Amino acid sequence: FLAKKVAKKLVSHVAQKQME
């Protein structure tokens, strides 16, 4: 499902923001 790919991208984006 596409939503899973989008969710993974969102999680990666949030994780990167919290790392900074």
UniProtKB/Swiss-Prot annotation:
<dbReference type="GO" id="GO:0005576">
    <property type="term" value="C:extracellular region"/>
</dbReference>
<comment type="similarity">
    <text>Belongs to the cationic peptide 04 (cupiennin) family. 04 subfamily.</text>
</comment>
<dbReference type="GO" id="GO:0042742">
    <property type="term" value="P:defense response to bacterium"/>
</dbReference>
<dbReference type="Pfam" id="PF17563">
    <property type="entry name" value="Cu"/>
</dbReference>
<keyword id="KW-0964">Secreted</keyword>
<feature type="modified residue" description="Glutamic acid 1-amide">
    <location>
        <position position="20"/>
    </location>
</feature>
<keyword id="KW-0800">Toxin</keyword>
<dbReference type="InterPro" id="IPR035164">
    <property type="entry name" value="Cupiennin"/>
</dbReference>
<dbReference type="GO" id="GO:0090729">
    <property type="term" value="F:toxin activity"/>
</dbReference>
<keyword id="KW-0027">Amidation</keyword>
<protein>
    <recommendedName>
        <fullName>Short cationic peptide-4c</fullName>
    </recommendedName>
</protein>
